[in-house]
Amino acid sequence: MKIAEIAKEAGVSVGTVDRVLHKRGRVSAATKARIEKIIQENGYVPNAMARNLKIGSNLKFGILIPKLDSESGYWHKIYNGIKKAGDEIAAFNISLVIKEFDRDEENSLNEEGKQLIEENVDAIALAPVIQKEAFSFVKSLKDIPYAFFDSSITNASPISENIQIAYKAGWCGARVMQLFSPNNNNFICLQMHESAYNQQQRAQGFIDFFKQKNIPIKTYTWKREKNLSFNKFLDSLFEDNNNIDGIFITNDATGLISKYVLKKELLNTPYIIGFDLVEDNKEELLNGNISAIISQSPETQGYNTIMDMYKILFLKQEDNINKCPIPINIIIKENLP
């Protein structure tokens, strides 16, 4: 068995198995006995790359991610997955360097990315949420491999992508909206970041689903550069849309918008569908104010991205990475985890 297989069988991390194999670090007696029993029964085949790796050699992975405290905690969930993977591979002298950028500040992504390059990282994982800026950055990387999480950009060549297919997610959102409200057709779509490619694709998927049914969708985008506050944006929107049947939101602002809708005296209560199981959205889903949430499994995104880089760059197992997109999980009140 290989080290990853032993770890899976024992229900521990690969780092824990490594500590037992090489008799370093602390491992509980029970865990050690369980791992040793698995090795004794099945054998252990050392990975050629790990066996031949020079003692003291290191790998450094750079992470380029939006501000962790932004967008209701969604990015912090991705960070949790990244950190979990980083802890598991730390035993192999692999370290993480994390830089946060402000997606609402021009050139912030590039500036933070340049700092990663200056730190001589061996690879970079990033969320390319600003399409033009991210494309410019990855083109500047030259020989540094890179991986994407959260979203993708066209004409790029990442070594790994852990993303949800945004267009299909928008289409699914429309399908669920129709199930909730089959006899109505007054729906609107709200996009919170004009430059976010994945949000554009979600909106397009939602629009195209209803287009085939000859139902036009009103689309609104919060354009932050116009210095229009979020509440004023919503005030203006609902002045023109007082009798809507459903609202589709392309990011995790769903809970904020549902709370706003409750305070407004609309002619009817619209169905609300959005993204991400952040705490605010969970609360509103349980209260019945949000109809459904599309989960992107952010922790899984972060974890798989780092493990893919580990497999490709350390283990040299390019064919052993997960190439399936993140599932489009529809969460309602009754199946909330």
Model-inferred region functions:
Residues 67-73, 98-108, 130, 162-171, ...:
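Hinge/beta->alpha junction and helix N-cap segments in small-molecule ligand-binding domains
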Residues 1-55:
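N-terminal helix-turn-helix DNA-binding module of bacterial transcription factors
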Residues 130-168, 278-286:
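Flexible loop/hinge segments that line or gate small-molecule binding clefts
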Residues 38, 210, 297-337:
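Hinge/cleft segment of the Venus flytrap/periplasmic-binding protein
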Residues 62, 186-190:
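Conserved beta-strand elements of the Class I
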Residues 47-107:
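Amphipathic helical "hinge" segments at domain boundaries
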Residues 123-139, 206, 223-280:
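Hydrophobic alpha-helical
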Residues 160-185, 281, 297-314:
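Hydrophobic alpha-helical segments within soluble ligand-binding/sensing domains
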